[in-house]
Amino acid sequence: MNTNQNDENIEKQPSQRGLKNRHIQLIAIAGTIGTGLFLGAGKSIHLTGPSIIFVYLIIGALMYILLRAIGEMLYQDPSQHSFLNFVSRYMGAKPGYFIQWSYLLVVVFVAMAELIAIGTYINFWLPDLPIWMTEVFVLVLLTLLNTLNPKFFGETEFWFGMIKIVAIIGLILTAIILIFSHYHTGTDTVSLTNITKGFEFFPNGVSSFFESFQMVMFAFVSMEFIGMTAAETDNPRPTLKKAINQIPIRIVLFYIGALLAIMSIYQWRDIPADKSPFVTIFQLIGIKWAAALVNFVVLTSAASALNSALFSITRNLYSLSQLNDDKILKPFTKFSKAGVPVNALLFTSLLILFTPFISMIPAISNSFVFITSVATNLFLVVYLMTLITYLKYRKSKDFDPSGFTLPAAHIFIPLAIAGFVLIFISLFCFKDTIIPAIGSVIWVLIFGLFTFFRKIKTAD
């Protein structure tokens, strides 16, 4: 399939290209900044000290290689609503069916988890309001938003992303001011030497260092969401190329910058593992409502993740209905006048609507934590299959050497595959992750066998 044919496919798309360059740039930024940075940075620092910076750089490099691979395939054919469509194209209908349904269910569980988190964050201000009511209200609101032209989704994500950026830049600027004023925290003077003083690469042992890889890996989950926006992006090729190329500097600025800021203000051993460093530091400079401020930031972060999940699941469901000739999926091919696969969106919202029931029943809620952990592990399976698909693409007639090609792909792709495999294997080495890891393997085996023996009807 050549570039001219793909350009014709772009014009024939029933969706509307309402996402502009600034939307995609902020979506890319928001995708690299998870809620975990605001709430979990203290725990990850406590686990392995300043060497956590190297862990973030390594995982960031793996994710950048993945996104360059996705970006190259989408650059060649930006008419695709989901980067997972390439699995069906280059690896076959059955692997495509397996990975798209797996990813769809994974993101449904992630969306449910984010909705539960939103209810909890709002409960911080409205403790007397039942959480289930909050969850239903937010879900209905975001569903209505997603029925509009994609530009409204882009605009919402733009401002959600801006809030996270302002919070991180505020933290970094605070650290710079405190460093130059030689501020004393009560235990020590704010200085970059707090990071290097008594530096040990493995302060809590090698096992803690490798355990931190899992935490950091799941902080980066959902960065691949940008691969769902190509078909609805105005002028997608240069826009996606620019957004993906800027990811490394964003990782350095927002993640590494925030970690350096936190560890320069407090010696890392003094940073509480169970409290947000953002709250601690903003309280230090006299912001009494620091807890409320950070709660607002993580609320918008969770709302952004849920909003993106609705968009992602809807487009994946539409893509499945396009690729497979199952009658049960046909209703999901319908687009509204606003250019939205509306039936797929409503079905997605109905699935997520089970969340309030999960919140209200403790036995189910406890089981759901396990299911969500299993689902999150499956992201690694998705990433691995995407990279293998990319290798198939490079050997196909569709490969465009003049496109957005990944330099030295023959070196970087095997390295990324090895990295993700090692992280997945490490899940079996720690008591907190071994059971969910076994659960994810069981899913791969059972659903994989089901897919293997099932007759997949592909659409023409």
UniProtKB/Swiss-Prot annotation:
PROSITE patterns found in the cross-reference section: AMINO_ACID_PERMEASE_1
Gene3D superfamilies per UniProt: Amino acid/polyamine transporter I
Protein origin, superkingdom: Bacteria
Chief subcellular location: membrane
GO biological process per UniProt: amino acid transport; transmembrane transport
Bilayer topology: Multi-pass membrane protein
PANTHER family recorded: D-SERINE_D-ALANINE_GLYCINE TRANSPORTER (PTHR43495:SF2), GABA PERMEASE (PTHR43495)
Homology family: Belongs to the amino acid-polyamine-organocation (APC) superfamily. Amino acid transporter (AAT) (TC 2.A.3.1) family.
Full protein name: DL-alanine permease SerP2
Natural source organism: Lactococcus lactis subsp. cremoris (strain MG1363)
